[in-house]
Amino acid sequence: MLHTGYDKLAIRLSTPETTYWAQVIYQLSHELCHYVLRQTSGGNETLKWFEETLCEAMSMYILKYFYETWDDCILSRNNYNYRESIKKYLEDIYNSQYGTGLAECKSEKQLRILSRLSERDRHERIRERNIVYNIFKSEPDKIKLIAEYQRYRNDIIIDFNEWKNERKDIFIEKLSEIHPRLDNVI
């Protein structure tokens, strides 16, 4: 959990033990992603359904990075073969069963409910999280663009058309695929 104040930052992880490195990596990278997104938010409230999806995908991307570079990590001296545990942890997350909440969301009211419950009901966004993770893997140099999302926020939705028109980048086009297609919003 990320706690911010005027002069300090505190991150609390809920891991059974600090040597469960895969979970520590996942949770810490998740909270650091929140921190970066909030630093670029201009004081605006976060768009929970979108931000949680981004941060979960980022955590998976960082797990992949640690798996690929484990030999370079000082922790590998304690357990050289732990890279396989990181890989399994990542695969288990990726292959999680998911609901269809975000994909089947058709109204602003449904999206507000889903957003409010987004931290608790993560399974409703797993499909979208995996899409974003795959986008991150295919376009790693463009990941930094996610910090711009608040500029294109329009209440509970993101104006991807404006973002795409301004950025003219395939990364934003791909990212827009996870946005619910609401009936009452153009």
Annotate the PLM regions:
Residues 1-8:
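Short alpha-helical hairpin
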Residues 3, 14-16, 176, 183:
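A structural detector for beta-sheet-dominated domains
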Residues 10-28, 40-47:
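Short pre-active-site segment immediately N-terminal to the catalytic Zn-binding motif
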Residues 25, 47, 51, 124, ...:
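Hydrophobic (often cysteine-bearing) scaffold residues that line and stabilize catalytic clefts
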Residues 25-42, 52, 56, 60:
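Active-site recognition of the HExxH zinc-binding catalytic motif
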Residues 35-39, 57-69, 134-139, 178-181, ...:
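Structured segments of extracytoplasmic/periplasmic soluble domains
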Residues 47-95:
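Post-HExxH zinc-binding segment in Zn-dependent metallohydrolases
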Residues 96-186:
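Pan-zinc metallopeptidase signature
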